[in-house]
């Protein structure tokens, strides 16, 4: 299911652990085609074309939310930033919060930023400005800078903030009797399959479009983060503590990243009441799950349960289908939309080169350029 590549991957996949082999066998038993997830983590010593050396991953388990002490994981601070600084043409200004893009005519002239430590305000002139500050902040900066026409859900006019999409995240937790050394792992160490992603399967009698990738990852369990107990376990007291300790190294999670389609009622805008520390309106997210989301969620959940049962757990628990969106429990931060790319200013914020239609020297870069969220992370 992988797309065509101009050249092979630079290194072999990360190690296939016993847990991943167990998932692979079960997936094949259900007729699917699992493969190791490509990862920006060195599986062996590697020197980049820029001359940056990366050591192999040690599978320490402190990876996906941490810096890498081995320089095995590709991060800005050990890839392009040191290379850029060596040219003498790059300066990194820390604690600088850009609050406005300055525009004159059909070009931007720079940015206004605030030193977050001293609260001093600075004007930085620029020949070219690149927004690369995540989906939400890219949209907010354009809005507070009054660049582009903000989307109005009542009329359908405007493009800025339009097309905000999320993800659906079906999943199941499996409990086993044998310990699995789950403290070891890496941020993208895992196995997945695309048999139920995109149009890789028949949608004739289904009530949704698109699909999602199903995966099992071994990122390194940490006690506070991971505290699964089997269904029926008491939620407090000695029974809970015993079950939590026993199952810490005996539970696995199978999950999916499901597509999210753009709807007129889901969008980003500026809040009319609440402001940030600099007196600017906060970004407001108007969003809820749809029947499309729920139908896809329920279908993928059944497919997850099939592979889960093939792994022969002693118990399992599936995530319930989503009702209304709730921002409190963490679900995903792989959002899209709000600054989508397209063929004209009437239907998009940027062109195919990610240049803003209203300012040729302003580039808006990020997952916000996608008009919907696919069945894997953008």
What does each model-identified segment do?
Residues 1-97, 328-331:
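Conserved redox-cofactor binding core of oxidoreductases
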Residues 37, 59-63, 99-104, 249-260, ...:
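A glycine-rich dinucleotide-binding beta-alpha-beta segment and adjacent secondary-structure elements
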Residues 46, 140-142, 374:
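Short glycine-/acidic-enriched loop or helix-start segments at secondary-structure transitions
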Residues 49-54, 103-109, 332-335:
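A short, glycine/Asx- and small/polar-enriched loop/turn
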Residues 82-86, 116-123, 341, 347-357:
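A short acidic-Thr-Gly-centered motif at the start of a beta-strand
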Residues 86-87, 96, 100-104, 111-187, ...:
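Glycine-rich loop(s) and the adjacent beta-strand/alpha-helix scaffold that form part
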Residues 157-284, 288-294, 332-337, 347, ...:
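FAD cofactor-binding and catalytic pocket of flavoenzymes
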Residues 372-378:
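A conserved FAD-binding loop/helix module that cradles the flavin
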């Amino acid at each position: 299911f992988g797309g065509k590549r101009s050249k092979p991957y630079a290194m072999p996949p990360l190690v296939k652990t016993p847990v991943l082999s167990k998932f692979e066998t079960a997936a094949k038993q259900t007729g699917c085609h699992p493969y190791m997830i490509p990862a920006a983590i060195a599986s062996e010593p590697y020197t980049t074309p820029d001359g940056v050396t990366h050591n192999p991953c040690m599978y320490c388990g402190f990876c996906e939310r941490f810096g890498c002490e081995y320089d095995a994981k590709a991060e800005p601070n050990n890839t392009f930033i040191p290379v850029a600084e060596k040219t003498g043409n790059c300066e990194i200004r820390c604690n600088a919060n850009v609050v406005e893009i300055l525009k004159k005519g059909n070009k931007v002239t720079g940015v206004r930023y605030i030193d977050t430590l001293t609260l001093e305000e600075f004007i930085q002139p620029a020949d070219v400005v690149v927004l690369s500050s995540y989906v939400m902040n890219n949209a907010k900066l354009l809005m507070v800078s009054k660049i582009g026409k903000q989307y109005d859900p009542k009329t359908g006019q405007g493009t800025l903030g339009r097309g905000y999409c999320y993800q659906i995240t079906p999943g199941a937790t499996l409990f086993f009797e044998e310990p699995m050394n789950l403290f070891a792992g890496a941020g993208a160490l895992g196995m997945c399959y695309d048999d139920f992603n995109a149009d890789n399967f028949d949608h004739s009698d289904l009530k949704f479009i698109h699909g999602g990738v199903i995966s099992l990852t071994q990122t390194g369990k940490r006690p506070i983060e991971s505290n699964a107990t089997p269904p029926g376990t008491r939620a407090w007291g000695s029974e809970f503590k015993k079950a939590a300790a026993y199952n810490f190294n005996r539970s696995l999670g199978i999950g999916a990243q499901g597509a999210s389609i753009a709807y007129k009622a889901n969008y980003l805008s500026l809040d009319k009441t609440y402001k940030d520390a600099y007196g600017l309106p906060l970004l407001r997210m108007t969003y809820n799950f749809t029947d499309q989301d729920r139908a896809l969620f329920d279908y993928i959940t059944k497919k997850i349960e099939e592979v889960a049962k093939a792994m022969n757990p002693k118990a399992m628990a599936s995530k319930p289908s989503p009702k209304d969106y709730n921002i409190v429990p963490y679900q995903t931060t792989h959002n899209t939309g709000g600054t989508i790319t397209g063929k004209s200013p009437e239907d998009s914020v940027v062109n195919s080169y990610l240049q803003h239609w209203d300012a040729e020297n302003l580039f808006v870069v990020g997952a916000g350029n996608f008009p919907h969220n696919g069945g894997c992370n953008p």
